[in-house]
Amino acid sequence: MAKEKFERSKPHVNVGTIGHVDHGKTTLTAALTIVQGKKFGGDSKDYASIDNAPEERERGITISTAHVEYESETRHYAHVDCPGHADYVKNMITGAAQMDGAILVCSAADGPMPQTREHILLSRQVGVPYIVVYLNKADMVDDEELLELVEMEVRELLDTYDFPGDDTPVIMGSALKAIEGDQSEIGEPSIGRLVDALDSYIPEPTRETDKPFLMPVEDIFSIQGRGTVATGRVETGVVKVGEEIEIVGIRPTTTTTVTGVEMFRKLLDQGEAGDNVGILLRGTKREDIERGQVLAHKGTVTPHTKFEAEVYVLSKDEGGRHTPFFQGYRPQFYFRTTDVTGACELPAGTEMVMPGDNVQMTVELINPIAMNEGLRFAIREGGRTVGAGVVAKIID
């Protein structure tokens, strides 16, 4: 059969495999490229090529990640797989690989293990919105009741971390059998069922331009006779001339009107996600606005000082600290375009945090920052990055 033309017109969805070491994440990743490649074209990848993932540096943090892609009937999937547990932690916290949904791989022969739990918790903390489960190695379990028991355990574990355990699709199969071309229920057809579950359970992601307008302020200029211009890159949404917007963060929120949008010295009617623009603001003085604030549509983002965060602390080899830090540690938190000092409160029972650790902490900033859950930040000491984090929950 001739391979169909590789289509780029399908909607693009980002997914990735998570789960305990040796439960078959990489084998399943290979199976997805092989089985879907037969149906829709695209590159098939074998286990070895995925397992030898290249090292990448994201914000100074070394992460090994394999990127593969495959098609379904209706979608194009970009899929990430990490060789080691530490790579998952770093990947999810830095948002190097944003996931619209995750495939939790759990060995039916072993059931949920410590990293199964940890990856579900991480998914909750960093805002992975959907999880689909693949119970792998089903060929190694003869007892039907045992399979049902493992499925029940996984569903309960998902419930524990506020994922809808009862409604989550759970697919039984064997990634290895699928790669071998096995046509029984647990072979190739199980991969088809998994992809169907991804198609139906993970909604199409909202395009950046369809989200509310937000632009971090990078620089401010005064133009004689015209007013004040704030420049930056539009993060999400669309801004149009004549709209009322808010200036949020660091100081009390103020409202202003957009009187012009320009890009490369040309006047535009609007600026949209990804554009580097200057926004002319009516009645706003140069001293009313500063770097680190954001421009946003009214009521879409609020300033906060206190939040729960999931943090990865750089190891010494990554250029991080050489020593641990303790309760009350006060570094700078770099949000979008600026540093704000904050105090760290460690969880009960945690005496200290070592370089290379990941930790949940509560942070209180000295100035409010415009934030939503899921916002990424860097932790810095004197301009040097020593950690990366994500806002897991806003407290105040």
Curated annotation (Swiss-Prot):
First-level EC class: hydrolase
Catalytic reactions on record: GTP + H2O = GDP + phosphate + H(+)
Keywords of this entry: Cytoplasm, Elongation factor, GTP-binding, Hydrolase, Magnesium, Metal-binding, Nucleotide-binding, Protein biosynthesis
Disulfide cross-links: none
Region spans: G1: 19-26
Matches recorded under PROSITE patterns: G_TR_1, G_TR_2
Domain of life: Bacteria
Residue sites binding Mg(2+) per the record: 26
Keyword Cytoplasm included in the entry's annotation: yes
Stored InterPro entries: EF-Tu_GTP-bd, EF-Tu_GTPase, EFTu-like_2, EFTU_2, G_TR_CS, P-loop_NTPase, Small_GTP-bd, T_Tr_GTP-bd_dom
Region of interest: G5: 174-176
Domain tr-type G positions: 10-206
UniProt-annotated stretches for the region G3: 81-84
Subunit structure: Monomer.
Protein name as annotated: Elongation factor Tu
Gene source species: Hydrogenovibrio crunogenus (strain DSM 25203 / XCL-2)
